[in-house]
Amino acid sequence: MTDSIRRLYDGVRAAHDQDPGSSRTARLLQAGPRKIAKKVAEEAAEGALDAAAGNRDDVVRESADLLYHLVVLWYEAGVQPKEVWAEMDRREKLYGIAEKIPKNRIVELKRPAVVPIDRARRRRAR
């Protein structure tokens, strides 16, 4: 699976320089991160609703659409697939493959260390 995501990412990168008039991906990239994020949310919602309704085949199709838009979002955000895989590997080591990282741990992991710097040192650093 990671190979197909990598190929998709490479295709998105190639589409970046294509004519938006002939490339849906180029058009989406040109629209910017807000539009791409909206499409990710839309596809996720559609897939979830299809799953709730028991429409298995539609879940498969919407999942493929979701992955496509997610990869476009990664490209737009400058995120490489290998970074996502590395994060998944890190989480697997901490919590196991089928567990999601607890919300309170996410906050702890994202919170930067605050180191007080006196004003004199700050002025010298400029």
Per-range role (PLM):
Residues 1-62, 68-126:
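Flexible "arm" and connector segments at domain edges
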